[in-house]
Design a protein with these regions (language model features):
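Thiamine diphosphate
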Residues: 1-142, 207, 262, 272-459, ...
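Active-site glycine- and acidic-residue-rich loops that bind
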Residues: 148-155, 210-217, 380, 436-443, ...
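Short beta-strand/turn micro-motifs composed of small residues
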Residues: 145-146, 174, 328, 376, ...
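Residue-level marker for buried hydrophobic side chains located in beta-strands
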Residues: 143-144, 172-175, 401, 435, ...
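Conserved acidic functional residues
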Residues: 146-149, 352, 522
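Alpha-helical transition-metal enzyme core signature, strongest for iron centers
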Residues: 148, 391, 546
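A short helix-loop-beta submotif of the ANL/AMP-binding
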Residues: 147, 232, 371
C-alpha cells in the first residue's frame, strides 16, 4: 500500500493546478479534471512506472488520456512529476505553447493526440497488443476514459479486442462522474451496468469509489497483476473538491474566473508546490532485431490484380524486416494481406470487422516503433476516417491500403465501391496517396510506404490488370508519375489517369494512334502529384487535358490536377479540360460494363480525345 497522505496531497495539488492553469487561460475543462484527480494522483505516485527524463524508454508504462479534454489534469501531472515547470503550466492554451487545449505529442510525454472522444482507449489497446505479441515488453498501458465517451462504439471495439487477446498489460480507468457536456450521461452512476458490459467483453471489472485513495491504490495494484485486461469502474463527482462545482450541471468546459478560482483554491486547502517522487521501470531493452534488408520483390509478367501484388509485397517485407506488422479487418483473403502470414504469421493481426479499432491499433503500434500496414475494402476505410484525421494530429506514421476501389469491382454493387476514398485521404494533413496500375508498381510503392513517414494510403484494384512495368530496376517515387504513351513535344492531347483507368487510357491512345498524338500520364502519386509533369503536358499539348478516374468527380484525381496547375500559375494556359469521372450512382454489372456506364472506359476517352484535338478555345466539362 502506498502513502495515503502523499496521494491526498498530490490530488489537492492536481486539483489546484487544473484550476489555476485553466483560469489563466480563460478556457478549458477544470471540472472534468477535478473528478479524476484522485485516480491520477494514486496512479502517478504509486503505480505508474515511468522515467520522466527518458520518455522514449521502451520499458516505460503508457498513460493515455482518452478523455483528452481533461488536459489541465494531464499537464498538472507532468508538473507534479517534474517534467514541466509551473511557469510552463501557466502557458496552457496560449499561442506557441506545447500545452495545447487537448494533448498532442508536441509534448514528449504524450503518446498520441486525444480529444476526439472514443479514441484513446482503442489506441491504448494497440500499444498493449504490440507489447504483448511483438515486443514482449514489460510495460503496462493505462487509459483514463470518461463516461460520456462510453457511448462511442469504438470504446467497445477496443474492449472487445482487449478481451479477445487477453491483454493483461491493459487497464482502462472509467471516470464515471455522471455528467456530460450538457447534462447527465446515458447511464449516470449505474456502475453495475458498466461493470457488466466490461465483463461481457472479456475484461475484469473492478468497481470502486473514485475518491477513496486506499480503494484506488488497491484497484491499481490488482490491475497491474491481473491475468487479463482490467476495467476500473470508478464512481466520481464532477468538480470534486469545490462545493459550488460538485455534481453541478452547466460547468462543463468552463474555466473559473479569478474570484471563483480564489474561492475554489481556498476550499481545496493548503497546496505546497512540490515535485512528487515516482517509480521508474526496471531496465529493459527489446530483443535485437535483424538489420532490415532490401525485400526481394517478384517481377510479374502476366496480368495480376494490384491487391494480390500488395499481399505478396507485404510477404516480402515481412521476410526482410522484423519491425513490419500487418492488420486487416477480416477481409485479408480479399485484400490479400493474409499473404503476410507466409513469412511473418506472428506479426499479423486479425482485427475483425472493426475498422476503427484496426486503425487505432495501427496508431498504437507505431508509438512503440513498429511499422504498421492496415487494410480493408476502401469503402469501409471511410468508417475510420476520424481515427485517420486524429492520427495526423498525432504525427503518426501509419500505412493504409484500401482495396476494391471504384465501379471496376463489378457485380457487388455500390455499397462495396469506394468512390470517396481519394477525396478523403487527400484531405488528411501531410498524407501521401498512391494508386498503382500494375503489380510491379504496387510492390515498389509498398516498399516506399515502409520507408516513408506520416500517413500513406494505397488504393488497389479488384480486377487483374496488364503489366506495364517489367524492368526489375524500375524506380518510382512519392510525387512522381510515368508517361506510358506519347511524350513528344508536339503531343496534341494529354490524358491523366491512375490505377484502372491508366489501362483504359492506353487503349484509347492506341486506338487513335496515327491520327492524334496522345500523351498518357500514369499519375500513380495522387498526393503529392507530379506538378512538373502536368505543367509540361499542358504546355506541350497547347492546354488540352483530359483526366479520367474511377472515383466521384469531386475531390479525386481531377481536383488534384487542377489544383496543381493553378498553383503552378498555368491554369490560364488550359485550352480545354475534360474530366471523366463517376457522376451517377452505379449499380451491379460486369466491370467493363460499369466502366463504360460511368463514362470512364476507353470508348469515352477516345471521344474526349477527339473532341479536345479538334477543339478551339473552350471551357471545361
Amino acid at each position: 500500500m502506498g502513502n495515503m497522505k502523499v496521494y491526498e496531497a498530490l490530488a489537492r495539488q492536481l486539483r489546484a493546478d487544473s484550476i489555476r492553469c485553466s483560469t489563466i487561460a480563460g478556457s478549458g475543462h477544470p471540472t472534468s479534471s477535478l473528478s479524476a484527480a484522485d485516480l491520477m494522483a494514486v496512479l502517478l505516485a504509486g503505480h505508474l512506472r515511468y522515467d520522466w527524463s527518458e520518455p522514449k524508454n521502451p520499458a516505460n508504462d503508457h498513460l493515455i488520456f482518452s478523455k483528452g479534454h481533461a488536459s489541465p489534469l494531464n499537464y498538472a501531472l507532468f508538473r507534479a512529476a517534474g517534467a514541466i515547470t509551473d511557469q510552463e503550466l501557466m502557458t496552457f492554451r496560449k499561442r506557441g505553447s506545447r500545452l495545447e487545449g487537448h494533448p498532442t505529442p508536441v509534448v514528449p510525454w504524450v503518446d498520441v493526440a486525444t480529444g476526439s472522444l472514443g479514441q484513446g482507449l482503442p489506441i491504448a489497446v494497440g500499444i498493449a497488443l504490440a507489447g504483448k505479441r511483438v515486443l514482449g515488453a514489460p510495460y503496462h498501458v493505462w487509459t483514463l476514459t470518461g463516461d460520456s465517451e462510453l457511448a462511442e462504439g469504438s470504446i467497445w471495439e477496443g474492449l472487445d479486442h482487449a478481451g479477445h487477446e487477453r491483454l493483461a498489460n491493459f487497464t482502462a480507468i472509467f471516470d464515471v462522474n455522471r455528467l456530460g457536456q450538457h447534462g447527465p450521461t446515458e447511464l449516470e452512476w449505474n456502475l453495475d451496468v458498466y461493470a457488466a458490459r466490461a465483463k461481457a467483453f472479456g475484461c475484469e471489472p473492478i468497481v470502486i469509489d473514485g475518491h477513496d485513495v486506499a480503494a484506488i491504490d488497491e484497484a491499481l495494484a490488482r490491475a497491474r497483476h491481473a491475468d487479463g485486461p482490467t476495467v476500473i469502474v470508478a464512481k466520481t463527482v464532477k468538480g470534486k473538491g469545490v462545493s459550488f462545482l460538485e455534481d453541478k450541471e452547466g460547468w462543463h468546459g468552463k474555466a473559473l474566473d479569478e474570484e471563483q478560482a480564489r474561492r475554489a483554491l481556498a476550499e481545496i486547502g493548503d497546496v505546497p508546490s512540490r515535485t512528487f517522487p515516482t517509480l521508474k521501470p526496471d531496465p529493459w531493452q527489446p530483443p535485437k532485431r535483424p538489420a532490415p534488408r532490401m525485400p526481394e520483390w517478384k517481377t510479374y509478367r502476366e496480368p495480376l490484380a494490384t491487391r494480390k501484388a500488395y499481399g505478396e509485397a507485404l510477404a516480402a517485407l515481412g521476410a526482410a524486416r522484423a519491425d513490419v506488422v500487418v492488420l486487416d479487418g477480416e477481409v485479408s483473403n480479399s485484400t490479400h494481406a493474409e499473404d503476410f502470414k507466409k513469412t511473418a504469421a506472428d506479426r499479423f493481426f486479425e482485427m475483425y470487422i472493426a475498422e476503427q479499432q484496426m486503425v487505432a491499433a495501427a496508431v498504437g503500434m507505431q508509438v512503440v516503433g513498429l511499422i504498421p500496414f492496415a487494410s480493408t475494402f476502401a469503402a469501409f476505410m471511410t468508417r475510420a476516417f476520424d481515427f485517420v484525421r486524429m492520427a495526423a494530429i498525432s504525427r503518426a506514421s501509419i500505412r493504409l491500403c484500401g482495396s476494391h476501389a471504384g465501379v471496376s469491382i463489378g457485380e457487388d454493387g455500390p455499397s462495396q465501391m469506394a468512390l470517396e476514398d481519394l477525396a478523403m485521404m487527400r484531405a488528411v494533413h501531410g498524407s501521401t496517396v498512391l494508386y498503382p496500375c500494375d503489380a510491379n508498381q504496387t510492390a515498389r510503392l509498398v516498399g516506399l510506404m515502409a520507408e516513408y513517414g506520416g500517413i500513406s494510403y494505397l488504393r488497389t484494384t479488384r480486377e487483374k490488370t496488364p503489366i506495364l512495368y517489367t524492368d526489375r530496376l524500375e524506380e518510382f517515387r512519392v510525387g512522381g508519375s510515368r508517361i506510358v504513351r506519347g511524350g513528344a513535344p508536339d503531343d496534341a492531347v494529354a490524358v491523366v489517369a491512375a490505377g484502372i483507368t491508366v489501362h483504359e487510357a492506353i487503349k484509347a491512345a492506341d486506338e487513335v494512334r496515327g491520327k492524334i498524338k496522345v500523351r498518357v500520364i500514369d499519375a500513380y502519386s495522387v498526393k503529392p502529384i507530379d506538378t512538373v509533369a502536368l505543367v509540361d503536358a499542358a504546355r506541350a499539348t497547347g492546354g488540352r487535358l483530359c483526366v479520367v478516374e474511377d472515383h466521384w468527380i469531386q475531390g479525386g484525381l481531377g481536383d488534384a490536377v487542377l489544383a496543381a496547375l493553378a498553383e503552378a500559375g498555368v491554369a490560364r494556359e488550359i485550352e480545354r479540360f475534360v474530366h471523366l469521372a463517376v457522376r451517377d450512382m452505379p449499380g451491379s454489372g460486369k466491370p467493363a460494363e460499369l466502366l463504360d456506364a460511368a463514362g470512364i472506359s476507353a470508348r469515352h476517352i477516345v471521344n474526349a480525345v477527339r473532341e479536345l484535338a479538334g477543339s478551339g478555345r473552350g471551357g471545361h466539362r
